[in-house]
Design a protein with these regions (language model features):
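Pyridoxal 5′-phosphate
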Residues: 1-185
Length: 185
């Protein structure tokens, strides 16, 4: 049967409106599709859970998440991050073969590493950048999602109040929807 993938943004990078990732993931899985999520806009503001612990449905999990830590506080020069369920990595040949992906080689034969985390990371890794990405996530965790969201919501409320008073500004999107402090007008 054909592979079905649903790939959505956890939040709009235009309006800041949040997606109900658990409900959408559940719907996708009930229809035999994989659930892929882009957290580029939402990642720095929300809790990122592959398997949300507070959800009743076992099919509300995410199969893959894409992150952009360079958008986080302290994140410039960090690499993009892919978090995916191990069973999705079934190809025994790496996408980009290179140094560090081969377990064995001789003139007649070769074998790639069995562990996809190592097999798919050919070449010289961006060590400093990866460490920086880890520190960015530690900073987010130390400050706390609730603190970040509360501060951002206060700033958003002030901005929206001022912009609504200006008749020549039209704010895009549903202002009553759960949203991040991202606004287009």
């Amino acid at each position: 049967r054909p592979l079905k993938i649903g790939s959505f943004s956890a939040a709009s990078n235009v309006t800041g409106i949040l997606s109900n990732t658990c409900a959408i993931a559940d719907l996708l899985h009930r229809h035999g599709a994989l659930s892929f999520w882009d957290f580029a806009a939402a990642g720095r503001y929300v809790r990122i859970e592959m398997n949300p612990p507070d959800v009743d449905s076992v099919s509300a999990h995410k199969d893959a998440i894409f992150l952009s830590p360079h958008k986080f506080i302290g994140g410039p020069s960090t690499p993009g991050v892919l978090v995916a369920r191990r069973e999705l990595f079934t190809n025994r040949v790496p996408v980009v073969p290179g140094g560090g992906t081969v377990a064995y080689v001789n003139p007649e034969d070769h074998a790639y590493l069995a562990d996809p985390a190592h097999r798919e990371e050919g070449g010289t890794p961006a060590i400093i950048e990866a460490v920086r990405a880890g520190l960015v996530f530690q900073l987010k965790e130390a400050v706390g999602v609730e603190t970040i969201r509360a501060h951002e919501e206060r700033l958003l409320a002030r901005a929206v109040e001022a912009w609504r008073a200006e008749p020549s500004i039209e704010i895009l999107g549903n202002l009553a929807a759960e949203r991040l402090s991202i606004v287009s007008f």
